[in-house]
Amino acid sequence: MEKNCYELQYPRDNLYLSCYVNESLNYRYHWHPAEYEFQIVLCGKQEFCRGKENFVMEEDDIVLVEPNAGHASFSTTLNTRTLVIRFSALAFKPFLKKGESFSFSGFPSGQKTRKGPRYTRIRFYAARLLDAASQASPYAPLAARGSAQLLLDP
Protein backbone atom coordinates (compact mmCIF):
# COMPACT_ATOMS: atom_id res chain seq x y z
CA MET A 1 0.00 0.00 0.00
CA GLU A 2 1.33 3.42 -0.94
CA LYS A 3 1.39 5.73 2.07
CA ASN A 4 1.00 9.50 1.72
CA CYS A 5 2.05 11.25 4.90
CA TYR A 6 0.96 14.84 5.29
CA GLU A 7 2.94 17.15 7.56
CA LEU A 8 1.39 20.40 8.80
CA GLN A 9 3.15 23.06 10.84
CA TYR A 10 1.65 25.95 12.79
CA PRO A 11 4.67 27.32 14.72
CA ARG A 12 2.80 30.23 16.30
CA ASP A 13 0.55 27.70 18.07
CA ASN A 14 3.31 25.11 18.70
CA LEU A 15 1.15 22.73 16.68
CA TYR A 16 2.87 20.22 14.43
CA LEU A 17 0.78 17.46 12.86
CA SER A 18 1.30 14.46 10.67
CA CYS A 19 -1.49 12.29 9.32
CA TYR A 20 -1.66 9.25 7.08
CA VAL A 21 -3.56 6.05 6.41
CA ASN A 22 -1.58 3.03 7.51
CA GLU A 23 -1.91 -0.66 6.75
CA SER A 24 -1.71 -2.41 10.10
CA LEU A 25 0.63 -5.35 9.60
CA ASN A 26 3.29 -6.13 12.14
CA TYR A 27 3.95 -5.59 15.81
CA ARG A 28 6.51 -2.76 16.07
CA TYR A 29 6.73 -1.45 19.64
CA HIS A 30 7.65 2.25 19.68
CA TRP A 31 6.87 5.59 21.31
CA HIS A 32 6.91 9.28 20.48
CA PRO A 33 8.78 11.47 22.99
CA ALA A 34 6.93 14.70 22.25
CA GLU A 35 3.77 13.69 20.40
CA TYR A 36 0.30 12.38 21.04
CA GLU A 37 -1.11 9.87 18.57
CA PHE A 38 -4.66 9.09 17.54
CA GLN A 39 -5.32 5.81 15.75
CA ILE A 40 -8.71 5.28 14.17
CA VAL A 41 -9.54 1.89 12.67
CA LEU A 42 -11.02 2.53 9.23
CA CYS A 43 -11.56 -1.11 8.30
CA GLY A 44 -10.58 -4.48 9.68
CA LYS A 45 -9.52 -5.40 13.18
CA GLN A 46 -6.28 -5.06 15.13
CA GLU A 47 -4.81 -5.91 18.48
CA PHE A 48 -3.35 -2.86 20.20
CA CYS A 49 -0.89 -2.63 23.05
CA ARG A 50 -0.47 0.65 24.96
CA GLY A 51 1.86 0.39 27.92
CA LYS A 52 0.59 -2.64 29.86
CA GLU A 53 -2.88 -2.60 28.27
CA ASN A 54 -3.87 -4.94 25.43
CA PHE A 55 -7.17 -4.64 23.62
CA VAL A 56 -8.83 -5.43 20.31
CA MET A 57 -9.88 -2.54 18.08
CA GLU A 58 -12.54 -2.85 15.39
CA GLU A 59 -13.80 -0.56 12.65
CA ASP A 60 -14.51 2.98 13.99
CA ASP A 61 -12.62 2.39 17.26
CA ILE A 62 -10.26 5.13 18.40
CA VAL A 63 -7.28 5.08 20.72
CA LEU A 64 -5.16 7.98 21.95
CA VAL A 65 -1.55 7.41 22.93
CA GLU A 66 0.16 10.00 25.13
CA PRO A 67 3.79 11.11 24.69
CA ASN A 68 6.42 8.56 25.78
CA ALA A 69 3.82 5.77 26.04
CA GLY A 70 5.06 2.64 24.34
CA HIS A 71 2.59 1.16 21.90
CA ALA A 72 2.22 -1.28 19.03
CA SER A 73 -0.48 -2.89 16.94
CA PHE A 74 -0.94 -5.72 14.52
CA SER A 75 -3.71 -6.73 12.20
CA THR A 76 -5.91 -9.68 13.08
CA THR A 77 -7.76 -9.49 9.73
CA LEU A 78 -6.59 -8.87 6.18
CA ASN A 79 -6.47 -5.29 4.87
CA THR A 80 -6.78 -3.56 8.22
CA ARG A 81 -6.34 0.18 7.73
CA THR A 82 -5.95 2.90 10.33
CA LEU A 83 -5.92 6.67 10.17
CA VAL A 84 -2.97 7.88 12.24
CA ILE A 85 -2.72 11.47 13.42
CA ARG A 86 0.25 12.58 15.49
CA PHE A 87 0.39 16.04 17.04
CA SER A 88 2.87 17.93 19.17
CA ALA A 89 2.54 17.91 22.93
CA LEU A 90 3.80 21.51 22.89
CA ALA A 91 0.39 22.65 21.67
CA PHE A 92 -0.90 22.22 25.23
CA LYS A 93 2.06 23.89 26.96
CA PRO A 94 0.27 27.21 27.66
CA PHE A 95 -2.42 25.32 29.60
CA LEU A 96 -0.18 23.14 31.79
CA LYS A 97 2.07 23.54 34.80
CA LYS A 98 5.70 22.51 34.46
CA GLY A 99 6.08 18.73 34.21
CA GLU A 100 2.37 18.07 33.53
CA SER A 101 0.99 16.44 30.42
CA PHE A 102 -2.48 16.78 28.99
CA SER A 103 -4.66 13.74 29.57
CA PHE A 104 -7.68 12.77 27.48
CA SER A 105 -10.08 10.40 29.22
CA GLY A 106 -12.23 7.71 27.69
CA PHE A 107 -9.82 6.03 25.29
CA PRO A 108 -9.90 3.54 23.72
CA SER A 109 -13.44 3.44 22.44
CA GLY A 110 -15.19 0.09 22.37
CA GLN A 111 -18.33 -1.67 21.24
CA LYS A 112 -20.60 0.35 23.55
CA THR A 113 -19.02 3.76 22.90
CA ARG A 114 -17.61 3.82 19.33
CA LYS A 115 -20.86 5.12 17.78
CA GLY A 116 -21.42 7.76 20.46
CA PRO A 117 -21.36 11.50 19.68
CA ARG A 118 -17.85 12.10 21.05
CA TYR A 119 -16.19 9.45 18.90
CA THR A 120 -18.32 10.31 15.86
CA ARG A 121 -17.14 13.92 16.17
CA ILE A 122 -13.49 12.84 16.48
CA ARG A 123 -13.77 10.65 13.37
CA PHE A 124 -15.43 13.49 11.44
CA TYR A 125 -12.73 16.06 12.24
CA ALA A 126 -9.95 13.51 11.70
CA ALA A 127 -11.34 12.70 8.23
CA ARG A 128 -11.72 16.40 7.49
CA LEU A 129 -8.12 17.01 8.61
CA LEU A 130 -6.78 14.27 6.32
CA ASP A 131 -8.90 15.50 3.41
CA ALA A 132 -7.76 19.12 3.82
CA ALA A 133 -4.12 18.10 4.25
CA SER A 134 -4.25 16.19 0.96
CA GLN A 135 -5.60 19.16 -1.05
CA ALA A 136 -3.48 21.56 -3.10
CA SER A 137 -5.84 24.49 -2.53
CA PRO A 138 -4.40 27.67 -0.98
CA TYR A 139 -7.16 27.45 1.66
CA ALA A 140 -6.48 23.82 2.56
CA PRO A 141 -4.04 24.69 5.40
CA LEU A 142 -6.74 26.84 7.02
CA ALA A 143 -9.30 24.05 6.76
CA ALA A 144 -6.78 21.57 8.16
CA ARG A 145 -5.93 23.85 11.07
CA GLY A 146 -9.59 24.41 11.91
CA SER A 147 -10.27 20.68 11.80
CA ALA A 148 -7.23 20.01 14.00
CA GLN A 149 -8.36 22.56 16.58
CA LEU A 150 -11.84 21.05 16.71
CA LEU A 151 -10.39 17.53 16.85
CA LEU A 152 -8.23 18.42 19.85
CA ASP A 153 -11.00 20.16 21.77
CA PRO A 154 -11.23 17.96 24.87
Task: Set out the residue ranges of the language-model regions.
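A hydrophobic/aromatic-rich effector-binding and dimerization subdomain
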Residues: E2-L17, G70-Q135, D153-P154
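Conserved GNAT-family N-acetyltransferase fold
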Residues: Q39, V63, L83
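All-alpha amphipathic helical-bundle segments outside canonical DNA-binding/catalytic cores
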Residues: A133-L150
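Generic protein-terminus/edge-of-domain signal
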Residues: M1-E58, S101-S103
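Amphipathic, well-ordered alpha-helical segments in soluble domains
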Residues: E37-I40, R121-R128, S147
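Conserved metal-binding segment of the jelly-roll/cupin
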Residues: M57-G70
